[in-house]
Amino acid sequence: MAFMAPARADIDNPMTRAVLNVYAQQLSEDPKDYETYLNRATVYYSNNEYLRALSDADNAIKYIPEKDAETRIRALTLRANIYLQTERPAEALRDLDATVALDPNSYVNVYLRANTRYTLGQYAGAREDYNRLLRLNPRSTEAMIGLARIAVKENNLGTATQYLDDAVASDPNNADIYVRRANVRRSMGNGSGAVEDIMLALSTDASNARATKLLVDMANTDYAVVIEGITRAIEQAPRVAMFVYLRAYIQQAHFHYKAALTDYNTIITQNLNDYRGIYAGTARCRYALGQYDSALADIDQALAAAPDNADNHILRAQILRALGRRVDAYSAAARALALRPNNTQALIELGLTAYSQEQYSQAADLFGEATMTAEGADAARAYMLRASVLEEHLNQPVAAAGFYRHVAEITAPQTQQNATTGAQPSATASDATAILSADPAMLRPLALLHCGERQAADAAMAAILALPDADGAHAFEAACYYAQAAKTYADIKKGKSAQGNTDMDTAFHYLEQALDHGYGDLHRLRDDTDAPANIAPLRTDARFTALYARFAHLF
C-alpha cells in the first residue's frame, strides 16, 4: 500500500470538473506541458482514476527536463504510488529506486521503498532502508516497526519484540504506534498482545478508526481472544462506555445476541452513555432473540431520536412482520423506501411484506426492482427471492430457473474475482471471509441445487465449510442448505427418500455444530421462513425440539 495519498475528492464535483477542463485546454495549447500533466495526474489519483493518472504521469516524466530533479522526483513518486495502489510493486520499486538516487535523504521515498521491498520479499534491502530511516531520524517509529516485521519473517521473535517495545517507548502517546505493534504481534501469533495494544490505542485515541477496524477484523478469526481482551480492558475501566459498546457490537456481529443485549443494557442502566441510537442495537438483538414486542418498543425509541433513519424503519418492518402485523410492516418498509429511494434492502423488505400478504405478483415485481440496483449479496438474494416466488406461487418455472442460473453464474469464484479486480486490497487476508451475510457466494450452493446440479452444489457448500467458522454461521448456512436439499428430494419423490433422509441427518449435524459454536439467532432458528435459506424443514423433527431445549441458554 502506498505511504500516502491525497485526500479523496469527488471527480464529478463541478469544481473538480472545471479544473480538469482548464488542464485539458492548457494541454491542447501545449501538449508537452509536463507541469499540467503532473497536476492533472494528481487530481486523477486523488479520485482513484488510476489508469488516467498513470497516463498523465507517464507523459509528465517523458517531458520533464533532466535538470529539473525536484519535479522529476514528484512525478516518479506519484507514479510509484499509482503502481502501489494497482498492486504493481515491482514497477513501483523501479521508480522509487530512481527517486532515492536523486534524493537519498528523502524520508518519504526511502520509507516507501522499504515497504515496497518488504512486500516483494526483499528483506535485506528493506532492512537497509529501515536502518537508513533510523539514521535520518533515530526516533523513527516507522523504521522500528518495519525492522520488527522483518524480524518476524525471519523468525527472530525476540528481536521483533525489542523493536516493537522501542517503537512504543519512543512515542507512547501515539495511538497509531499501538495499532502498528498490534498488527505485528498478530503476525507473530500473539493475538492477546495484539488486542491489548488495540485497547491501549483506543484508550489513547477513542476515535482511532484503524484500531477499531483491526479489532473487528481480528474478531472474524480470533473471536474468543478478542472478547477476552476487551473484557480485561472493561475490568480495568468498567465505566468506559466505548469498551462495553465495542464488545456488544462484536458479539452482535457474531450472532451472540444474548451477551450483546446484556452489554447494551449495561450502558443504558448504568447511564454510561445517553446515545439514543443504542436502542437500535437492543432492538436488533431482541428481534434475533424472538423478543418481538420488546424489540418494537426499542426500535420506536431509536426512531424517536432519529425519525429519518431508513435502516431503522427496515428493522421495524422486520419486527412487525415477525409479529404478524403485515399491513404495518408494509407501511414501515414503504417509509424506508421513501427515505432512501431505490434502496435494495428496503425493496427486498417491501417485497417480503407483500409476500407475507400473499401478494405474490407484487412481491416478484419488487424483488425484480431490487435486482436493478443491487450488488453482491443483495443482488444474489433479490434474484433468489424472485426465483422462489416465480417457481412456487406464479407457475413460471422457466423464468425461475433462469434466475437461479444467474445467481450461480454471478457467484462463481472467477466472477467474484473479476468483480473485485481493481479494488483496493483488504487490510488482512481474512477480510475476504469476514462477514458471512455480505458474501454473495453463500447463496451459490442453493442456486446450484435449484438448477439441479447437486454435485456442484455440494462442492460449493464444502468450500464454504472449509473457511474459518468462529461463530457457527457457516455451519448454520450448511444446515439451511441440507434442510432445503432434503425438502427438494421429498418434493421430487412425493415423500421420504434415502437421499432426503441423509440430507436431514447432515442438516442436523451442522445445526448442532452451529449451536455448539454459540450461534444465537433464535429468529432464524425457530421462526424464519424467508426464502431461500431457512431451516423450516427441520422444525417438525423431534431432533429439532431436543436441540432447541439443549441450547436454550443461548437465547
Feature roles, as predicted:
Residues E29, Y63-K67, L102, L136, ...:
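Structural marker of alpha-solenoid helical repeat scaffolds
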Residues R186, S192-V195, A209, K213-L215, ...:
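Alpha-helical protein-protein interaction modules
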Residues V19, A53, A92, A126, ...:
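Single-residue signature of alpha-solenoid repeat helices
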Residues Q25-Q26, N59-A60, A98-T99, R132-L133, ...:
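Canonical positions in the second alpha-helix
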Residues P14, N48, E87, G121, ...:
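Residue-level detector of the short coil/turn that links helix A to helix B
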Residues Y45, L84, Y111, Y118, ...:
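Position-specific recognition of the canonical hydrophobic site in helix A of tetratricopeptide repeat
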